Structures are given as C-alpha cells and as structure tokens.
Amino acid sequence: ALGVMVKQDLEDLGMKVNFKPVEFNSLVNKMTNTNDWDMAIMGLTGTPLEPHDGKNVWTSNGSLHLFNQRPNGYTIDDRLDWEKELDEIFREGALKLTYEERKPLYDKYQTIIYNQKPIIYLYSPIRITAIRKKFKNIFPTSLSGLIYNLDEVYIN
C-alpha cells in the first residue's frame, strides 16, 4: 500500500514511476549485491537506546549502507568527506565508555545525517501507548516511541 501511495504522489509531481514490488530477500540482494535498483522503500528498525546500533546503516562499509554504494572493486578511499566523518564517529564511539564521552559523538552523527539527508524517512507508524500512572517522566514521541529516555523514568 505504501509503495502505491508513493508512486501516485511522485506521478502527481510529474515523475514517471515503474513500481515493482519484490520479495524481501530479493530486494535485499538487489540492494546489497547487484546495485540493480534506482529507488527502494524499506523499513529500518533499531533501538533509540543505543545509537551505535545504527552502525550497519551509517558506516561506509555497513551491511545496510544503501546510499553512495560503490561497485565491486572500488575501495573505501572514495568515501565522501561526511561518510569518512561518520566512520570515525562510530569508531570512536565504540571506544568510549561513559555517556558524557559518547553523547557529543552521536549528537554530531545525527547532525551530519540531518544535513546530508542520504535517506528520506517517509513516515512513522501510528502508535497507541498506555502508561500506568505510577510511571513518571515518560513522554512518548512519534519517532522515538516510549523508551528513548529510559534512564530518566521512575516509579512513584
């Protein structure tokens, strides 16, 4: 349904779209092995509690690094400057132990992603959340869900 809606929206803007749904494993194979695709709709998941979980998407050699892909034979030396910076941030982030050391790094990575926009997020699902009154300092968001600030939640 989402693909049909995106196709219609793009056609309304004057673009010609050949929408062809494919089985998930075939899609992943095309995107990661053959580079035989122009545009894809895919859901990426992760936890808002650990920013390093995004390493497989945001580092230039990550298994789901689906933008600025390089044909076989190209080396990592042809990375864009901001991709090199992301690689370094994730390398450094893995070596830091404290929140105070890690937060500036992952804040910077989010700023780079915001500025470069290598992926366009189309939507966030509607969620219905129920919270018992005894839990305090919980503020669900449409993007981060319920537990983005788990370290600040308490029971009264």
Regions found by a protein language model. Name each.
Residues 1-8:
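Bilobed "Venus flytrap"/periplasmic-binding protein-like clamshell domains
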Residues 3, 21-24, 75-87, 95, ...:
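Solvent-exposed, acidic/flexible segments
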Residues 8-22, 85, 92:
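A local structural motif
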Residues 11, 15, 32, 45, ...:
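Hydrophobic alpha-helix feature that most strongly marks membrane-spanning transmembrane helices
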Residues 13-68:
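Periplasmic binding protein-like
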Residues 30-35, 56-91, 124-156:
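Short, solvent-exposed loop/beta-turn-alpha elements that line the ligand-binding surface or hinge
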Residues 39-43, 94-133:
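Bilobed periplasmic-binding protein-like "clamshell/Venus-flytrap" ligand-binding domains
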